[in-house]
Amino acid sequence: MWLAAAAPSLARRLLFLGPPPPPLLLLVFSRSSRRRLHSLGLAAMPEKRPFERLPADVSPINCSLCLKPDLLDFTFEGKLEAAAQVRQATNQIVMNCADIDIITASYAPEGDEEIHATGFNYQNEDEKVTLSFPSTLQTGTGTLKIDFVGELNDKMKGFYRSKYTTPSGEVRYAAVTQFEATDARRAFPCWDERAIKATFDISLVVPKDRVALSNMNVIDRKPYPDDENLVEVKFARTPVTSTYLVAFVVGEYDFVETRSKDGVCVCVYTPVGKAEQGKFALEVAAKTLPFYKDYFNVPYPLPKIDLIAIADFAAGAMENWDLVTYRETALLIDPKNSCSSSRQWVALVVGHELAHQWFGNLVTMEWWTHLRLNEGFASWIEYLCVDHCFPEYDIWTQFVSADYTRAQELDALDNSHPIEVSVGHPSEVDEIFDAISYSKGASVIRMLHDYIGDKDFKKGMNMYLTKFQQKNAAAGNL
């Protein structure tokens, strides 16, 4: 994920005012404009708070999720039906939940009667809910059902509303998601930890004149029985995935599409009337996927990849499985009014997020402590990819200015921190998305690559991705 600065840099302020800044400013400031950094690009380490991870006595196998957003009232209704494994007998289920009201909950052991929850104990500070049951849930598999409601918030996290203006000048809203680091719990009750993976069957009930997107391709679209103005859109089952990589979008979009040379359908969604501005990102993505496939010697595991420009988006971009979300300025290129530095920036952003489809999505770090591997690796290989696809950019010269030198300057400060930071409470996670994790992490990976040599480095990447695909890994595994 690329994150924007908390204290706006000069480049970020210019981005808000209009067209991208001139090349020199992009060269110096583009890194900090993508990341949630403090005034010097170095996050202050948070005070440690007591924290316990979710108990392991109940875990999900598959989550069937149906959401019905209301784009006028800014609310949503949801139904979760999770196939779960009870590993240790218990009379409660602890999940992550924030800013959501649970209406009903029940658990049905396989082949047995449904047991209705008798209480919901919200631990708001820890963003958890405990579902209490009147009898013990025995070991084995069963189905957890939860009905809930929530708000399409205006905080650009969780399931939120994004304001846009139609070509005719009308203000409307899209419903979009941003779940990294710990905000899937704001869209549905879930096991919102990187190490807990499940498959997802997602359905969206949306206005029939809106585009509905999610991680996988659409497998069914039919009229909604209770309202002739709505349709229910069902998506194919995802691979096993962590909750922070789940995504869905409902809005009005144009698109351009192509196929990469290895047969993956690539689609770029743009605001209505701006499809032409998505063609450069489409070209980059179509070149990037085969490069990573060849470099890792691991094929892209899904049939399609969607890239979409979001009007209101806090992050620079987010690598959701198969539905990568971007700020408009990080994805769209006006072919008549853009400079070379703008194209280079978009190429780097696309290269970064698509690298995560392998390094982060296919193989996921076990906990946020290992963020520097996830983001440091993507921040390095984005340059390798762009240099291969667009050698005329001479992009490695920008790495020295934008990452290597910046990492050295920040690491020399008294308030610097180790490249790997122990993380516990959710409030601590965002604090490590800084230039040490990204730029120093990328610089260390670059040194390792140069020391080992490209041939052996590629061999090691293949072994790592093959061994841990669809699983979690820690720094020691690499």
Swiss-Prot record:
Protein's organism: Homo sapiens (Human)
Name of the protein: Puromycin-sensitive aminopeptidase-like protein
Co-factor note (free text): Binds 1 zinc ion per subunit.
PANTHER family to which the protein is assigned, alphabetical: PROTEASE M1 ZINC METALLOPROTEASE, PUROMYCIN-SENSITIVE AMINOPEPTIDASE-RELATED
GO biological process terms held by the UniProt record: peptide catabolic process; proteolysis
Site (Transition state stabilizer): residue numbering on this chain: Y438
Active site as annotated: E353
Lineage of the organism: Eukaryota, Metazoa, Chordata, Craniata, Vertebrata
Cytoplasm among keywords: no
GO function term, MF aspect, one: zinc ion binding
Binding site for substrate: E180, G316, A317, M318, E319, N320
Binding locations of Zn(2+): H352, H356, E375
Cofactor: Zn(2+)
A Pfam cross-reference name: Peptidase_M1
Enzyme Commission no: 3.4.11.-
Family in the record: Belongs to the peptidase M1 family.
Keyword terms: Aminopeptidase, Hydrolase, Metal-binding, Metalloprotease, Protease, Zinc
Function: Aminopeptidase with broad substrate specificity to several peptides.
